[in-house]
């Protein structure tokens, strides 16, 4: 699709349904080619910068493996690896990197930062995550749902449970609206998305034959779901008062077997962008348990480890979908 050539991937709202479907189909094709050994490098001799203000396992590995598979060279700049925002403006960093690299990935805090990189670098820029959005994650989520459920995207009943304001919830709602899905956002009223984003997504959903429901009623929200999705309730670095308040608000929205059963769908699947606090077996998980007495947070270990959980297939699909984004915007077809 020539109209994706040289375009940045900052938010799904920049793309039409046809374009998102193209990226998902390309993801399937590239995944199949990798599995059977027929993959052709379409990013040969391309140089890609990975600019990370926030550390990551899946996003970094997905971009690096995808780039190497496609013949590209990668430079990783971690949280202390560049002067952007410290000794150099984002605008200046964009122009420096744009002169050396063919594409730039950014994972960090501000959506405005990734937009500035795209505006001034002169090369495709890909959003690996900001506080407001996470578009590459959603491509992996949707591809996984289609693979497992064997349904067209528009026929999937997709439900997000938890903090309705966070970047993953925002991105999922955008993607579901574009793809014409039936999307439910189940969250406390205090954690609803902004009216501006909600209204925009509802309008897009209506244009594509989809539907968006926001509710704090768990029974109503999860009924008939094909996918139950959640994310962490709080982020490290947020003050203790925020943790305490958020935990109290979200305790009833923990994804557990009872919630999965309430869907009434024996084939419902569970998705999560990871990492997940489903037990106290990590350093942070142990700290949460010691401070708040909570061993399992947004999802129980029972659900996380169940047959319904597709989180590791979903994690692998980060690489295939990210590869599709890079190939579509930078590759030589």
Swiss-Prot record:
Pathway: Amino-acid biosynthesis; L-arginine biosynthesis; L-arginine from L-ornithine and carbamoyl phosphate: step 1/3
Localization of this protein: Cytoplasm
Pfam family, one: OTCace_N
Keyword Iron: no
Single GO MF annotation: ornithine carbamoyltransferase activity
Enzyme superclass (EC): transferase
Residues at which carbamoyl phosphate binds: 56-59, 83, 107, 134-137, 273-274, 318
Keywords: Amino-acid biosynthesis, Arginine biosynthesis, Cytoplasm, Transferase
Keyword Membrane: no
EC assignment: 2.1.3.3
InterPro entries tied to this protein: Asp/Orn_carbamoyltranf_P-bd, Asp/Orn_carbamoylTrfase, Asp/Orn_carbamoylTrfase_sf, Asp_carbamoyltransf_Asp/Orn-bd, Orn/put_carbamltrans, OTCase_ArgI
Annotated catalysed reactions: carbamoyl phosphate + L-ornithine = L-citrulline + phosphate + H(+)
GO cellular component, one term: cytoplasm
Residue sites binding L-ornithine per the record: 167, 231, 235-236
Gene Ontology biological-process entries: arginine biosynthetic process via ornithine; citrulline biosynthetic process; L-arginine biosynthetic process
SUPFAM superfamilies, A to Z: Aspartate/ornithine carbamoyltransferase
Function: Reversibly catalyzes the transfer of the carbamoyl group from carbamoyl phosphate (CP) to the N(epsilon) atom of ornithine (ORN) to produce L-citrulline.
Family according to the record: Belongs to the aspartate/ornithine carbamoyltransferase superfamily. OTCase family.
Entry-linked HAMAP family: OTCase (MF_01109)
Protein name per its UniProtKB record: Ornithine carbamoyltransferase
Name of the gene encoding the protein in the UniProt record: argF
